[in-house]
Every structure is written in structure tokens, then in C-alpha cells.
Amino acid sequence: MTKIKWLGAFALVFVMLLGGCSLPGLGGASDDTIKIGAQSMTESEIVANMIAQLIEHDTDLNTALVKNLGSNYVQHQAMLGGDIDISATRYSGTDLTSTLGKEAEKDPKKALNIVQNEFQKRFSYKWFDSYGFDNTYAFTVTKKFAEKEHINTVSDLKKNASQYKLGVDNAWLKRKGDGYKGFVSTYGFEFGTTYPMQIGLVYDAVKNGKMDAVLAYSTDGRIKAYDLKILKDDKRFFPPYDCSPVIPEKVLKEHPELEGVINKLIGQIDTETMQELNYEVDGKLKEPSVVAKEFLEKHHYFD
């Protein structure tokens, strides 16, 4: 895929912070080059590469990848400014509460319908159906611990919660809505001790027995690699974060072939698969472009 180019997102962020202007030469879909935005997350870069490679295989279009978009807000502003033509990964729960300013919706189908309708109405953007994975917070334990304590759901933690050590990312304890305070209100119990830490440290902490349970990201590859167990959120406390691509209707009108290409990925990547792909990058240190290509080849997208 020699036509795929990487564009430095730091310049994009700098320009937007100064005045919301588009970068020179990056405004909209021009010269048959489609600019695909990837957030600064492993799975976003993997999926962005899948989209780019499929577009270049199936069409006569070129692609450029704009990576390291540091937040959902930065990604959204980049699309509003015409600096990217495709958002590779947008999450229903995030855009529902942040971009749209609406109350969290716990039903995945309803949440998806709301963001699809509102993005069409407010921005003339097409929010596609989900790839098939949901990257949400998930209470996670070792399988050995789950068997010993007879735990399968979050509610099962309640019996001995006062004895458990919980590792969480730094921000969650103070988050409004789906943070610790809301959790206690919904589930009716507190943990004996909570330990805030960087999200990347929670997996080793629970694997090595430093923590009894941790709050993880459901698509992180270490969940599968470390043979951890995600507990069912039986009271549906966390809102859904189903992942989808988003494209302005203007771009689809200029390049109608894009919709068919994108639809090839819809519903084809479940949470377990995304865990595996993420681990190929984070655990085995493969490049996202290589992992994307291997997935597409394995599933006969290039045949």
C-alpha cells in the first residue's frame, strides 16, 4: 500500500488551537485523496489502516492517514474543519454525551440510533452501524480469582467487596455520571480500597495479584493475553461505546464508492477480535498497518 501517507496530527492540533483554521492543503476531499483520521489509540490506528488499504484496493482513490488525534473533541473539530474526510473510530456513548450534550443512554441500539439521527441532522454526517465491538469500561479479574470467589457479574463482587482492592485509572474516581460515585449509587457497595493508576498499569496489577479487581478497557489485548475475565455489567451501569466510522454526506456524494467499501467492515470485528488485534500491536510490537493487512488478507478482503 505505497500510496498511503501519514500526516502529522500535531500541526493539525496546533492550528485548530490557534484559531480553528484548516491546515493548508488539507481542506476536504481533494485530488482524489481521502484523509482518514485516527485517534491516538492502537485500535483507531489499526482500523484507520484497514479503511485506507480497502479504499486503495477497491477504488482508484488515494489515502492519507492523519494520526495522533488526541481526543474525540480534536477528531470532531478536524472533521468540522475539513481536515479529515473519515473518522475511523467514533464511540456512541462518547459522542452522545460530549458532542451532542445528551444524557447517557444505556441501551446500545437506542444510543446508536440517537447519534446516527443527530449527526445527520446537526452536521450532515453519516454515522455508520458498528464494526461490531464496544470499547467500554469493564470490571476485570483473573479467572482463578473468579472461580475461587464464585464471581461472574459485577453484583457478585458485593458479598466481599469490603475486602477487595480495586485498581482504576486516575480519572474514573472523580468522573461524573459513570464514575465511582455513580457506580456506588447503582450497585450499592464500595470496595475496601481503591488505587488510582495509569490505565496501562491495571492489567499487570491484577495479573500479578497486586489488585483483586481492576477497571479495564474491554478491547485491550492484555485481557485475552493474560487470560483475564470480564465481569458482566448486570445492572448496565456503563453506557455503550459501540465503535463506528463517520463520514460527511458531502464526501460520500463526491465519492459514492466509499460507502460500499466502508460497509465491508461493518459488523465484522467483534470485541474479542479487536482485543487480539490490539495485542498484536501493543504486545507483539507489530505496526498497525501490518496488523490491518494481515486481518484483511486472512478474511479474504483482497481476493
UniProtKB/Swiss-Prot annotation:
Gene Ontology annotations of biological process type: amino acid transport
Lipid attachment points (S-diacylglycerol cysteine): 21
Gene3D superfamilies: Osmoprotection protein (prox), domain 2, Periplasmic binding protein-like II
GO cellular component: ATP-binding cassette (ABC) transporter complex
Annotated signal sequence range: 1-20
CDD domains, alphabetized: PBP2_OpuCC_like
Molecular-function GO terms, alphabetical: transmembrane transporter activity
Swiss-Prot/TrEMBL induction comment: Repressed by OpcR.
Subcellular location per the Swiss-Prot or TrEMBL entry: Cell membrane
Major place of residence: membrane
Keyword entries, A-Z: Amino-acid transport, Cell membrane, Lipoprotein, Membrane, Palmitate, Signal, Transport
Lipidation, N-palmitoyl cysteine type: 21
Membrane topology designation: Lipid-anchor
Record-stated family: Belongs to the OsmX family.
Quaternary state and interactors: The complex is composed of two ATP-binding proteins (OpuCA), two transmembrane proteins (OpuCB and OpuCD) and a solute-binding protein (OpuCC).
Task of the protein: Member of a high affinity multicomponent binding-protein-dependent transport system for glycine betaine, carnitine, and choline.
PANTHER family: ALIPHATIC SULFONATES-BINDING PROTEIN-RELATED, CHOLINE-BINDING PROTEIN
Protein name: Glycine betaine/carnitine/choline-binding protein OpuCC
Annotated organism of origin: Bacillus subtilis (strain 168)
Higher taxonomy: Bacteria, Bacillati, Bacillota, Bacilli, Bacillales
Gene that encodes the chain: opuCC
